[in-house]
């Protein structure tokens, strides 16, 4: 009887195992994709007042809207350089919107357009998307455009996030004969030189980032047949001087500043002057010792958190764990690494 019982149990186990393999096999062959993988956000267009505005709207309509303004001489698709944290951004519920500037990418060059023209383009796009209030995220040469927008519609701006940029570009020291010297004029025909990062930049930890930056530079200066025409870039540098000091006294919301102390384009005095030009804003500064002109990417995780929560909380990695701490919770005797733990080769 006992041997018969074992035989029945063995047979049952064999049948169950074969049934499991059958199900597994069926599952393998039934997992066909229900949609295509994304190759990045689609560039859309809006015809308005005899001109075409090119823009990207990346996120759900229910997400928190953020107008992203890329650096000097970038196209609407510079937004792709933020996609290495796209999944995290989606988890936070942030909707990124980018509007292309005059003469770059797909947008024809018009020498009569100025910074106010771009600000109106941004307003037209957010109105078209039925967005009332939104945050601004400006990096490097995009910072003055963010200030211009805030000066025109301060009541619609929930927060401003300025990374690797200056409170004022158009100073007397920088403006010579009405424009800033174009140090890029001889290299824009070489996208790999224009948008190349130094070998020690942390962005090289991100697969494909540098190549995406090369593609962005090529798109900016060749996409619409520009053939590396220097005029749009010269014009943009002139606009900084034409604007000079942008009056942002009417903005009273939160302003977050992100800067590296080793950034060759930003000095200590520049970092100190934000209060002067945003006298009524609630200013929070994130200063990163020894870091350069790539904090907008290295600390994108912190920027996204600030846009979402608008608090003074710091994202740190300690002992392999991601922690979000209030500034007064930081124990300065402990070893923290700012940002997500994924940035680290080893836990601290």
Regions found by a protein language model. Give the residues of each.
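The serine-hydrolase catalytic nucleophile loop
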Residues: 72-85
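Flexible "cap/lid" loop of the alpha/beta hydrolase fold
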Residues: 160-189
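Conserved acidic catalytic loop of the alpha/beta-hydrolase fold
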Residues: 117-134
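Alpha/beta-hydrolase
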Residues: 180-182, 186-246, 336-343
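Conserved alpha/beta-hydrolase
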Residues: 89-106
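Catalytic active-site module of serine/aspartate enzymes centered on a nucleophile-bearing elbow/loop
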Residues: 281-347
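Short beta-strand/loop motif that positions the catalytic acidic residue
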Residues: 251, 257-259
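Conserved alpha/beta-hydrolase "acid-adjacent" motif
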Residues: 264-270
């Amino acid at each position: 009887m006992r041997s018969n019982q074992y035989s029945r149990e063995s047979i049952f186990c064999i049948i169950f195992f074969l049934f499991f393999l059958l199900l597994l096999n069926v599952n393998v062959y039934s997992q066909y994709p229900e949609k295509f993988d994304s190759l990045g956000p689609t560039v859309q267009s809006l015809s308005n007042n005899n001109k075409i505005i090119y823009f990207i709207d990346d996120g759900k309509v229910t997400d928190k809207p953020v107008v992203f303004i890329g650096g000097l001489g970038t196209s609407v698709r510079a937004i792709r350089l933020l996609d290495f944290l796209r999944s995290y951004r989606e988890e936070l519920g942030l909707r990124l919107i980018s509007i292309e500037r005059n003469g770059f990418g797909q947008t024809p060059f018009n020498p009569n357009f100025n910074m106010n023209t771009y600000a109106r383009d941004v307003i037209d796009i957010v109105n078209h998307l039925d967005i009332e209030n939104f945050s601004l995220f400006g990096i490097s040469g995009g910072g003055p455009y963010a200030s211009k927008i805030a000066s025109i519609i301060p009541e619609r701006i929930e927060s401003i996030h300025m990374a690797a940029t200056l409170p004022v570009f158009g100073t007397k020291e920088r403006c010579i004969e009405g424009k800033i010297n174009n140090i890029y004029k001889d290299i824009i025909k070489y996208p790999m030189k224009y948008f190349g990062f130094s070998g020690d930049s942390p962005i090289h930890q991100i697969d494909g980032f540098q190549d995406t930056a090369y593609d962005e530079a090529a798109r900016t200066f060749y996409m619409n047949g520009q053939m590396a025409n220097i005029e749009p870039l010269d014009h943009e540098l002139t606009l900084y001087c034409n604007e000079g000091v942008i009056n942002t006294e009417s903005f009273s919301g939160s302003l977050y500043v992100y800067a590296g102390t080793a950034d060759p384009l930003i000095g200590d005095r520049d970092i100190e002057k934000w209060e002067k030009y945003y006298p009524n804003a609630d200013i929070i500064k994130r200063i990163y010792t020894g870091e350069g002109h790539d904090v907008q990417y290295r600390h994108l995780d912190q920027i996204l958190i600030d846009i979402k929560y608008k608090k003074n909380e710091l994202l740190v990695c300690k002992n392999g764990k991601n922690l979000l701490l209030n500034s007064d919770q930081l124990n300065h005797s402990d070893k923290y690494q700012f940002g997500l733990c994924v940035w680290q080769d080893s836990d601290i």
